[in-house]
């Protein structure tokens, strides 16, 4: 993905992470003018182990660690080797704030990602903004690094207000789920109820049908907000929670859908935090709060 030449580079930085690093790296950028479109581009290498990385010594080290820390059984060497190759990963995500207000987080297993804000489009996981001015903070959220010398690059580009109409050369397929990727999800929705009508279902008044943990493409789910809402309407739930990883961007979208389509469903606002000590599922959360300051709110 490349930006159009009329997007001005505002900030660019690179860095290197070594194996085992866990932490947050925040870059603070004072915007020199007002922008009406913004692209926050982050990429890194070495997401997975290569064949040559998985040596007998590494296999033995990880097997010993799993047994000691998690009381895991001893696996056959080849099975464990395949697990290391295909299931272990470097996990890095990105979050942005504008003047200390949360404006988005992309929680997906991508080595190259764009947090893109234009007049017509905002990347999944991000909150649309009219303009950008003041102080932008981009936080690199590092949850696991497999290999030494893992390189990353962060580039912020934008279109200043008043510099004419633009047509940025973005391949949006890099940042959003495609229709092809959602075919199975759409088929599942149709199978549940082809008419997608929210018919009333007689149930005891003391019993409610709830779905309290749901992800969408706003983080690492496979359904769009609309697909999830229609699926649950067809399934006659009384209420459901939207709990995407580390972002509240889907809440307003689902609220709008429920209002437009008059579905008799209650939305429970929430979010699933990814922390360095596991995940936290929070309900009745309408505004993004950093996980490490939850106890202050």
Label each region the model flagged.
Residues 1-210:
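Acidic, Ser/Thr/Pro
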Residues 201-297:
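A metal-dependent hydrolase metal-coordination microenvironment
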């Amino acid at each position: 993905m490349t930006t159009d030449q009329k997007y001005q580079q505002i900030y660019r930085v690179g860095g290197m992470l070594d194996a085992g690093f866990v932490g947050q790296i925040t870059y603070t950028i004072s915007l020199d003018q007002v922008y009406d479109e913004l692209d926050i581009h982050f990429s890194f290498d070495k997401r997975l182990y290569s064949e040559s990385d998985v040596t007998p010594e590494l296999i033995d080290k990880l097997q010993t660690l799993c047994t000691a820390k998690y009381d895991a059984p001893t696996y056959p060497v080849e099975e464990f080797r395949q697990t290391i190759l295909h299931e272990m990963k470097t996990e890095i995500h990105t979050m942005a704030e504008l003047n200390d207000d949360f404006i988005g987080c992309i929680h997906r297993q991508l080595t190259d990602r764009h947090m893109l804000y234009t007049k017509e489009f905002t990347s999944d996981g991000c909150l649309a903004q009219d303009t950008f001015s003041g102080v932008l903070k981009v936080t690199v959220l590092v949850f696991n690094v497999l290999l030494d010398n893992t390189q990353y690059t962060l580039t912020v580009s934008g279109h200043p207000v008043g510099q004419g109409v633009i047509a940025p050369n973005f391949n949006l397929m890099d940042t959003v789920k495609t229709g092809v990727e959602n075919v199975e999800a759409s088929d599942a929705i149709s199978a549940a109820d082809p008419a997608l009508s929210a018919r009333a279902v007689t149930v005891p008044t003391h019993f409610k049908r709830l779905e309290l943990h749901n992800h969408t493409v706003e983080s690492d789910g496979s359904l769009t907000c609309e697909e999830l809402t229609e699926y649950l309407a067809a399934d006659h739930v009384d209420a459901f929670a939207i709990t995407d990883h580390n972002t509240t961007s889907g809440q307003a979208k689902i609220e709008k859908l429920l209002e437009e389509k008059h579905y008799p469903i209650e939305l429970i606002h929430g979010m699933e935090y990814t922390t360095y000590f596991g995940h936290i599922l929070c309900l009745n959360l309408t505004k993004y709060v950093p996980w490490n300051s939850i106890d202050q709110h």
